């Protein structure tokens, strides 16, 4: 002991141990230690109070430090692996190719204004506007290119849980849902005026998404909105009338998340019953169920057609599905800390393990090669589909749980002009709304008459640390 500790350190250790024995009502042990050290330690009541709890604090500090060291070693190992797999040529190509772009810390912008945790983010399909919802009951509109707050929208009386841009052609709207049981529609072209409130759910509304107009047979051509709720239902709304046109029953617990397919034909939902469901919008029937998670399912994502070659190979298929098909593959994230990837029949393809806490949100890279996930472990993880979902990057920039992630919509280049709300009317370029930025029935490089899709290398995340972060190339 004398070789490891100075006399003063040894004395403080003895005092801490004796104080611990006394606080734990072990006077005999304290007396025995005093006798062993020849009662050289003077410990009156005030001194004992000073040292009480010090031993426990030292112990827990060591445990926390050990965990931090292990986390840093794992991070160092991941970075070393990434460095080893990169050559100057591949790095140069990756930096220039949007298909291979992945976010890096630090974020380009850290947007601060919310007073409570950020629950959701959404990009405007045309302009550089980013909406964020928060438990502080507000929605904030930011210019993500400049990193500036444009306006604060008030109207909900409880936490705003989700936000989404979409709506009919030529009339982009912002939808929000809340723990106050309502969905609200806001008009970006009229200073985000609240144009409609949709009541009907019997409990908190946990997710809201516009259903894309999509392919032939898709009803009402972009006028539909889907919501998920703690009342165990999904509701489909006509945004032009405000009426609920269909209620979907099937889940037996809180429905946490829902996303539509790019062609508007299917919905994918999941929640606290640990079951994900694929729904046919036209019939309202469940097409497939997905079973396997051991805890609540927090989030879902539909894989865009650009992922099909990678996922078909993992599923053992010789030929991928045609790009015109939708909802061929899906992903779910859960409080069991795993991500699961499935085919449309409910067959499990891959289980992704790596997060140390609840998985809160998922988004596929528009280029098709990566899946990004965020978690209560404060990280963004990037999984490479071409390497059987190997985690190739861990981004640690947040200081608390990361609650949401969205990718900026793709841009259609040389596809005709755009009106104020995204309607095509001349020459120019148009940002692409919808799920994962995919045009239903179109090829990535030729979506209708020579237009090309330009991937925007921009993502946004929200966190319990009250910040919205924008990562961009």
Swiss-Prot record:
<keyword id="KW-0206">Cytoskeleton</keyword>
<feature type="repeat" description="WD 1">
    <location>
        <begin position="113"/>
        <end position="154"/>
    </location>
</feature>
<dbReference type="InterPro" id="IPR037190">
    <property type="entry name" value="LIS1_N"/>
</dbReference>
<keyword id="KW-0131">Cell cycle</keyword>
<dbReference type="InterPro" id="IPR006594">
    <property type="entry name" value="LisH"/>
</dbReference>
<dbReference type="InterPro" id="IPR056795">
    <property type="entry name" value="PAC1-like_LisH-like_dom"/>
</dbReference>
<feature type="repeat" description="WD 6">
    <location>
        <begin position="354"/>
        <end position="393"/>
    </location>
</feature>
<dbReference type="InterPro" id="IPR036322">
    <property type="entry name" value="WD40_repeat_dom_sf"/>
</dbReference>
<dbReference type="GO" id="GO:0000922">
    <property type="term" value="C:spindle pole"/>
</dbReference>
<keyword id="KW-0677">Repeat</keyword>
<dbReference type="Pfam" id="PF00400">
    <property type="entry name" value="WD40"/>
</dbReference>
<dbReference type="GO" id="GO:0000132">
    <property type="term" value="P:establishment of mitotic spindle orientation"/>
</dbReference>
<dbReference type="GO" id="GO:0005874">
    <property type="term" value="C:microtubule"/>
</dbReference>
<feature type="region of interest" description="Disordered">
    <location>
        <begin position="80"/>
        <end position="99"/>
    </location>
</feature>
<keyword id="KW-0853">WD repeat</keyword>
<feature type="repeat" description="WD 7">
    <location>
        <begin position="397"/>
        <end position="434"/>
    </location>
</feature>
<keyword id="KW-0175">Coiled coil</keyword>
<dbReference type="GO" id="GO:0070840">
    <property type="term" value="F:dynein complex binding"/>
</dbReference>
<dbReference type="GO" id="GO:0051301">
    <property type="term" value="P:cell division"/>
</dbReference>
<comment type="function">
    <text>Positively regulates the activity of the minus-end directed microtubule motor protein dynein. May enhance dynein-mediated microtubule sliding by targeting dynein to the microtubule plus end. Required for nuclear migration during vegetative growth as well as development. Required for retrograde early endosome (EE) transport from the hyphal tip. Required for localization of dynein to the mitotic spindle poles. Recruits additional proteins to the dynein complex at SPBs.</text>
</comment>
<dbReference type="Pfam" id="PF24951">
    <property type="entry name" value="LisH_PAC1"/>
</dbReference>
<feature type="compositionally biased region" description="Polar residues">
    <location>
        <begin position="80"/>
        <end position="93"/>
    </location>
</feature>
<feature type="repeat" description="WD 2">
    <location>
        <begin position="156"/>
        <end position="196"/>
    </location>
</feature>
<feature type="coiled-coil region">
    <location>
        <begin position="60"/>
        <end position="87"/>
    </location>
</feature>
<feature type="domain" description="LisH">
    <location>
        <begin position="9"/>
        <end position="41"/>
    </location>
</feature>
<dbReference type="GO" id="GO:0005875">
    <property type="term" value="C:microtubule associated complex"/>
</dbReference>
<dbReference type="GO" id="GO:0005737">
    <property type="term" value="C:cytoplasm"/>
</dbReference>
<dbReference type="InterPro" id="IPR001680">
    <property type="entry name" value="WD40_rpt"/>
</dbReference>
<dbReference type="InterPro" id="IPR017252">
    <property type="entry name" value="Dynein_regulator_LIS1"/>
</dbReference>
<dbReference type="InterPro" id="IPR019775">
    <property type="entry name" value="WD40_repeat_CS"/>
</dbReference>
<dbReference type="InterPro" id="IPR015943">
    <property type="entry name" value="WD40/YVTN_repeat-like_dom_sf"/>
</dbReference>
<keyword id="KW-0493">Microtubule</keyword>
<keyword id="KW-0963">Cytoplasm</keyword>
<feature type="repeat" description="WD 4">
    <location>
        <begin position="250"/>
        <end position="289"/>
    </location>
</feature>
<comment type="subunit">
    <text>Self-associates. Interacts with NDL1 and dynein.</text>
</comment>
<feature type="repeat" description="WD 5">
    <location>
        <begin position="292"/>
        <end position="352"/>
    </location>
</feature>
<dbReference type="InterPro" id="IPR020472">
    <property type="entry name" value="G-protein_beta_WD-40_rep"/>
</dbReference>
<comment type="similarity">
    <text>Belongs to the WD repeat LIS1/nudF family.</text>
</comment>
<keyword id="KW-0132">Cell division</keyword>
<keyword id="KW-0498">Mitosis</keyword>
<protein>
    <recommendedName>
        <fullName>Nuclear distribution protein PAC1</fullName>
    </recommendedName>
</protein>
<keyword id="KW-0813">Transport</keyword>
């Amino acid at each position: 002991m004398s070789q490891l500790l100075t006399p003063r350190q040894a004395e403080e250790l003895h005092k801490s141990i004796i104080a611990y024995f006394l606080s734990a009502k072990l006077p005999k042990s304290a007396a025995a230690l005093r006798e062993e050290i020849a009662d050289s330690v003077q410990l009156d009541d005030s001194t004992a109070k000073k040292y009480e709890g010090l031993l426990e604090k030292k112990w827990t500090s060591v445990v926390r430090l050990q965990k931090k060291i292990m986390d840093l070693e794992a991070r160092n190992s991941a970075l070393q692996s990434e460095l080893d797999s990169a050559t100057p040529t591949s790095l140069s190509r990756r930096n220039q190719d949007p298909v291979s772009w992945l976010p890096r810390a630090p974020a380009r912008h850290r947007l601060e204004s919310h007073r409570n945790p950020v629950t959701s983010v959404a990009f405007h399909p045309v302009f550089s506007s980013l909406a964020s919802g928060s438990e502080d009951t507000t929605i904030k509109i930011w210019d993500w290119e400049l990193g500036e707050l444009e306006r604060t929208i008030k109207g909900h009386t409880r936490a705003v849980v989700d936000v989404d841009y979409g709506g009919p052609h030529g009339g982009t709207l912002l939808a929000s849902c809340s723990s106050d049981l309502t969905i609200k529609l806001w008009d970006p072209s009229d200073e985000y005026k609240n144009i409609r409130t949709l009541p009907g759910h019997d409990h908190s509304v946990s997710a809201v998404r516009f259903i894309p107009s999509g392919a032939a047979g898709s009803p009402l051509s972009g006028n539909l909105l889907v919501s998920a709720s703690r009342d165990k239902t999904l509701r489909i709304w006509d945004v032009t009338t405000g009426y609920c046109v269909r209620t979907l029953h099937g889940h037996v617990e809180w429905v946490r998340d829902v996303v539509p397919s790019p062609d508007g034909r299917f919905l994918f939902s999941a929640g606290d019953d640990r079951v994900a469901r694929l729904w046919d919008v036209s019939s309202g029937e469940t097409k497939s169920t997905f079973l396997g998670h051991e805890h609540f399912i927090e989030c879902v994502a539909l894989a865009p057609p650009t992922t099909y070659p990678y996922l078909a190979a993992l599923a053992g298929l010789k030929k991928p599905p045609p790009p015109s098909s939708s909802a061929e593959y899906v992903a779910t994230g859960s409080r069991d800390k795993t991500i699961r990837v499935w085919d449309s029949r409910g067959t499990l393809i891959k289980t992704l393990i790596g997060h140390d806490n609840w998985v809160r949100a998922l988004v596929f890279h528009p280029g098709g090669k990566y899946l990004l996930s965020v978690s209560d472990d404060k990280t963004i993880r990037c999984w490479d589909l071409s390497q059987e979902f190997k985690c190739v990057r861990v981004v640690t920039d947040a200081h608390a749980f990361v609650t949401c992630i969205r990718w900026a919509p793709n841009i259609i280049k040389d596809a005709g002009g755009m009106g104020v709300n995204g309607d095509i009317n001349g020459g120019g370029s148009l940002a692409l709304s919808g799920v994962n930025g995919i045009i239903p029935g179109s090829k990535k490089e030729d979506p209708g008459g020579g237009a090309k899709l330009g991937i925007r290398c921009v993502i946004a995340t929200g966190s319990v640390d009250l910040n919205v972060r924008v990562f961009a190339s």
